[in-house]
Amino acid sequence: MNSEFRAPTAVERVFNRIFGFLVGLGLGFSYNYLLQVRGRKSGRLFSTPINLLELRGKRFLVAPRGRTQWVRNAEAAGEVTLKKGRTQQRFRLQSIPDENKPEILKAYLDNFKREVQRYFPLQAGSPVQAFDELAQNYPAFELIAV
């Protein structure tokens, strides 16, 4: 798996904080959640807003920026909490192998193109086979309720 990631700009960091605060209050679309995970070194609780993909009755997290800090922390912790308003749920992470990611990546881009298109070299609506070569650049996890 590729270890690089695209760091957020200063504007994106400010937007993520504001949007994360709103999602934490329970606002946002049905797929918006605040992901909470313990830092792998500090043990501190970190939060970031995410788009949760539901596909064939399963829940998936995709990291459109690559191996970000939340990805590294989540892999180390083995579990995350999704929060929206007063509702919280813990999940165990199951990493998706690269060969199984194309369908998930396509669905993610097609569903959330307005928010994530800039992180993908393909256009939303591209055929699933076009995602084969990209799979290693985008960590993806199935969420399993704890």
Predicted regions and their residues:
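Short beta-strand segments
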Residues: 30-64
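A generic structural signal for ordered alpha-helices
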Residues: 1, 13, 21, 28-30, ...
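Alpha-helical membrane-targeting segments
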Residues: 1-32, 117-126, 133-135
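Short low-complexity stretches enriched in small and charged residues
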Residues: 4-19, 44-50, 61, 96-101
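Short, structured beta-strand-loop surface elements
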Residues: 58, 65-146
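Short, functional N-terminal and low-complexity linear motifs
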Residues: 2-3, 37-42, 70-76
